[in-house]
Amino acid sequence: MATTRKPRGGAGGATQPALDFDAPGEIVCGVDEAGRGPLAGPVVAAAVVLDPARPIVGLDDSKALSAKKRERLFDEIVVHALAYSVASASVEEIDSLNILHATMLAMKRAVEGLSVLPTLAKIDGNRCPMLAIRSEAIVGGDALVPSISAASILAKVTRDRMLVELHQQFPMYGFDAHAGYGTPQHLAALREHGPCEHHRRSFAPVREAFDLIR
């Protein structure tokens, strides 16, 4: 599991501003994930505390944005956000815990990796991970809450980059084209070549491919 985060600003990082960008009197972080559905690769989560003094134009659900726009916004978020953290849960953790619990684990790691301590975490979806701070689940939050939109972009871009790197090691699967999702191309490659160590054995199509090569 790798976590990246933006250092806290200010003199020695001793103080935190009171933010009212998402909720008056709260320091809010938005949290989202990428990669619950794919057959391969980690699940990635991000947590973002936006800076109301440095607004970012064009934030939206990462799935509604082109790859080019996601990359541009990724660069803006890491520069202008007050704090951000990106974390993951591995394929091994997905297979041992199940994808839901692995996703919650990645989200927890992302929030705990923030250099600014939030008072409220707004989570995309209908479930919240176990956190030491208050949390709120918001269905469709990645299109409604700017900090969640920012988190969705960081998580998506980070994971897509990971899968491009995996493609360099395992070009036969086409990870750069489908990011590990169960496309016809990917399923055909699974049948032809069998799974690699980055495939999720707890997912049915991968299990079936393992059975074919036994």
From Swiss-Prot:
Q: What does this protein do?
A: Endonuclease that specifically degrades the RNA of RNA-DNA hybrids.
Q: Name one GO biological process term.
A: DNA replication, removal of RNA primer
SUPFAM superfamilies linked: Ribonuclease H-like
Q: Which residues form the signal peptide?
A: none
Primary localization: cytoplasm
What's the encoding gene here? rnhB
Similarity section: Belongs to the RNase HII family.
InterPro entries in the record, alphabetically?
A: RNase_HII, RNase_HII/HIII, RNase_HII/HIII_dom, RNaseH-like_sf, RNaseH_sf
- Pull one GO CC term from this UniProt entry: ribonuclease H2 complex
Keywords of the record: Cytoplasm, Endonuclease, Hydrolase, Manganese, Metal-binding, Nuclease
Q: Where, by residue number, does a divalent metal cation bind?
A: 32-33, 124
Biological classification of the source: Bacteria, Pseudomonadati, Pseudomonadota, Betaproteobacteria, Burkholderiales
Species of origin: Burkholderia pseudomallei (strain K96243)
Q: Which reaction does it catalyse?
A: Endonucleolytic cleavage to 5'-phosphomonoester
Give any GO molecular function from the UniProt entry. RNA-DNA hybrid ribonuclease activity
Name the cofactor(s).
Answer: Mn(2+); Mg(2+)
> What is this enzyme's class at the first EC digit?
hydrolase
The name this protein carries in UniProt is Ribonuclease HII
